[in-house]
Amino acid sequence: MLSLLESSLVSRDQFKFRSDCLKSDKLRTYNSLFTSNISYFSVISYTRLCLPFILRKKLAQLRLGCLPIRIETDRYTRPIVHRDQRYCLQPNCENILSNLSDDAKHIENEYHFIMNCSQYDQLRSEMFAQIQAVEFFQMNDDAKFIFLLTTQSVAKLVAQFIVNAFDARLSHL
């Protein structure tokens, strides 16, 4: 009886938590991690990892939508840049190198930062080369993104990628 009550309360709390999260535009990446085949506990399991502070911080910032990339930082510029115009401005990004029109440019969001920005191609290749999961290389990019942000065994690699990418950003200022 007690187990049933506990299970019911946990389910209710998870449902309320998810409902509240879905209302937040800032949690766009975090919300995208919840798919039908990924459990709630695997999404939050990275919080229990023993990682150095800076790695935990950067990983949490990315997942929670407060990593200082343009999708987030341009919320605070005046005048506010509309979210559909917060393009990636990294010097080696395709947006800059190819002189793309506005409708073809990539918005600098968490997905672009981790999966696509050519500024970080070398770092991304190094990270992918260290991933031991065979199934990772058979996934499409969306599935890879979710895998990278929900799998404990690669959390440290992803966090180190983020730290290294930000170090590279600072060297291009």
Regions found by a protein language model. Name each.
Residues 7, 13-173:
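Family-specific functional microsites
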